[in-house]
UniProtKB/Swiss-Prot annotation:
Span of the annotated motif CCCFC: 195-199
Residues involved in pyridoxal 5'-phosphate binding: G115, E116, F117, G118
Taxonomy, superkingdom: Eukaryota
Pathways per UniProt: Cofactor biosynthesis; thiamine diphosphate biosynthesis
Organism: Candida albicans (strain SC5314 / ATCC MYA-2876) (Yeast)
Active-site residues, as the UniProt record annotates them: H66
Function description: Responsible for the formation of the pyrimidine heterocycle in the thiamine biosynthesis pathway. Catalyzes the formation of hydroxymethylpyrimidine phosphate (HMP-P) from histidine and pyridoxal phosphate (PLP). The protein uses PLP and the active site histidine to form HMP-P, generating an inactive enzyme. The enzyme can only undergo a single turnover, which suggests it is a suicide enzyme.
Family: Belongs to the NMT1/THI5 family.
InterPro entries per the UniProt record, alphabetical: NMT1/THI5, SsuA/THI5
Keywords, ordered alphabetically: Iron, Metal-binding, Pyridoxal phosphate, Thiamine biosynthesis, Transferase
Organism lineage: Eukaryota, Fungi, Dikarya, Ascomycota, Saccharomycotina
SUPFAM superfamilies to which the protein is assigned, alphabetical: Periplasmic binding protein-like II
Residue(s) carrying N6-(pyridoxal phosphate)lysine: K62
GO biological process, one term: thiamine diphosphate biosynthetic process
Listed name of the protein: 4-amino-5-hydroxymethyl-2-methylpyrimidine phosphate synthase
Amino acid sequence: MSTNKITFLLNWEAAPYHIPVYLANIKGYFKDENLDIAILEPSNPSDVTELVGSGKVDMGLKAMVHTLAAKARGLPVTSIGSLLDEPFTGICYLEGSGITSDFQSLKGKRIGYVGEFGKIQVDELTKHYGMTPDDYVAVRCGMNVAKYILEGTIDCGIGIECIQQVELEEALKEQGKDSNDAKMLRIDKLAELGCCCFCTILYIANDKFIAENSQAVKKFLKAIKRATDYMLAHPREAWAEYGNFKPTMQTDLNTKKFQRCYAYFSESLYNVHRDWRKVNNYGKRLDILPENYVPNYTNEYLSWPEPKEVDDPEKAQDLMLKHQEECKTCGGYKRLVLA
């Protein structure tokens, strides 16, 4: 049965990069499409794919590797679009912790991770660096990786550059220390993946819900695209509106996170075919996907032109690294423009 009432589950408590979803609600874009969206926050981020897959929630947000693994485990979920494209993801640590750019420096260290796939990724990496999973201590942290590093509960942990890395940098500044002492061992470099696409944040939906509500899905994405376009064109105004609706966003820390997220937002919302192929292969390497697995994504419900894929994704990642370093130093809102 089709419906205009949709439950939408975030992948975490409200964060700066959730702004398109909230803006679509704040500015009445969902209402313009005759949609009534209930935006929900999970008590446990690991529950999202299970709740969406079970049909208890209609739609949500989740990273690409989790979305692939969920379908492989029998949960009927499909990606219908992209929110945050390839945020740099890796093992965050502080200078002076005994950890260096050498992966083997992680021997004996306490490594924090959000959910089970973070541990699977680190375990797989140990095989390539003359180690075993017994050579480190895994600590499940949920979304508290930066907090636990600063408290000394863990030595390092998996996070993304525009969130946990920013938290570490700003904490160092408050202590009168150099923010450059917040470091990251990028997983895409360690695993030689050629992209950080495994952590691309996606709009996902329950398969039965999609089948019964195809027009509502199209309308939802149309409203999200409208909100994304507004945010990219007017980032300061959009951020102020989000902060008025969600006062927890009104901090210097969250503003800096939003500035660092800004370049990662997907303008088109399209699932990138090459990224899905790469992460599908990576999932097989991690033994979380069968060899014959077909990626569970579709661009069918996006009603605007699909952009051309980047010619050289590795070069684009190098340029993004420089871009994000500039954003860290200067702040502001600037998109990476590829020639």
